[in-house]
């Protein structure tokens, strides 16, 4: 539902950028970041780079583990559905020696079984817990006293109250609970690489453009990119991708494409199909129940076609 509300707004902003600043680069934080980038890169001429803080937190964890930033990596996925598939030091892949994946404060933490990690030999981003251990993750969410959304509302109300004080000079502790760690570092680093033509490597949301042969060229993926003053360009991977990763990416990408179409046209059929193809739902009765409730609750904020 976030996408159905946000895609039209971001498209409107993009149209203004096309008119007022056609050479600008738009670094997008708006969630759902991958779907927003999918919409803007395929339906506008704006130079969009999608951004998330998952990778930079994963990179920081590996750096802390190794005691050095002198390592290379391969990275594949979509926004909130991504993996580090190799970590090399002096040409040697040390992925298996790195231990358990990094966790994030805004996601219920579950301990991965060694056999699970061995079955898909890659470091999963924290959001993969929802796919790897769907029932256990759902159980944790249902047992929690409050939903993540309710917690975020409380955090933001507290932050906004503190920001009313012009004398505030310290970073509120609530910021560490919101789940946006290192976002500023990621954004400034990419902006710096573009503005100063640095030819640096960063992970970003961009069009596939042939970098992953199992995805469509126009699919927006999250990839290791070479970034310079012309934009961000995905780097082709050297290693073969696990079939599980390929299959999951393709099914979630189908969901993203259908969601963009639904958001732009107000098509209930496309919205329903999007939910049915998503691996976390995949059931007509569940999809219909959720969609009916959410379309009703958000009627004034979404495409009017949904209400016709």
List PLM regions with ranges.
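Charge-dense, low-complexity intrinsically disordered segments
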Residues: 1-4, 49, 177, 246
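Soluble or luminal CAZymes and related metallo-dependent hydrolases
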Residues: 2-9, 54, 182, 251
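A non-catalytic, amphipathic alpha-helix used as a structural packing/dimerization or gating element
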Residues: 12, 57, 250-254
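Intrinsic structural disorder
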Residues: 18, 32-35, 53, 232-233, ...
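Rossmann-fold dinucleotide-binding core
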Residues: 25, 29-92
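Long, compositionally biased stretches enriched for glycine and/or charged residues
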Residues: 63-308
């Amino acid at each position: 539902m976030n996408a159905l509300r946000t895609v039209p707004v971001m498209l409107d902003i993009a149209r203004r950028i096309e008119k007022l600043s056609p050479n600008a680069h738009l670094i997008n934080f708006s969630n759902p970041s991958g779907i927003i980038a999918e919409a803007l890169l395929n339906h506008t001429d704006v130079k969009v780079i999608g951004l998330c803080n998952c990778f930079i937190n994963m990179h920081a964890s590996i750096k802390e583990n190794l005691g050095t930033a002198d390592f290379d990596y391969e990275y594949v996925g979509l926004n909130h559905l991504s993996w580090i598939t190799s970590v090399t030091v002096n040409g040697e892949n040390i992925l298996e020696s790195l231990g358990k994946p990094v966790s994030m404060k805004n996601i219920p933490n579950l301990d991965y079984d060694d056999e699970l990690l061995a079955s898909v030999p890659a470091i999963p981003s924290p959001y993969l817990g929802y796919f790897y251990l769907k029932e256990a993750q759902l159980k944790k969410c249902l047992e929690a006293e409050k939903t993540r959304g309710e917690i975020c509302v409380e955090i933001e109300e507290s932050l906004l109250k503190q920001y009313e004080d012009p004398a505030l000079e310290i970073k509120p502790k609530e910021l560490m609970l919101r789940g946006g760690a290192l976002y500023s570092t990621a954004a400034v680093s990419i902006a710096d690489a573009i503005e100063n033509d640095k030819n640096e490597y960063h992970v970003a949301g961009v069009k596939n453009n042939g970098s992953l042969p199992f995805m469509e060229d126009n699919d927006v993926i999250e990839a290791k990119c070479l970034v310079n003053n012309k934009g961000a360009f995905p780097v082709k991977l050297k290693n073969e991708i696990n079939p599980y990763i390929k299959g999951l990416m393709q099914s979630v990408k189908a969901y993203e494409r259908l969601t963009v179409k639904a958001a732009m046209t107000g098509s209930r059929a496309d919205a329903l199909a999007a939910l049915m193809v998503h691996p976390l739902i995949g059931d007509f009765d569940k999809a219909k129940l959720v969609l009916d409730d959410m379309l009703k609750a958000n009627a004034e904020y979404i495409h009017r076609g949904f209400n016709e």
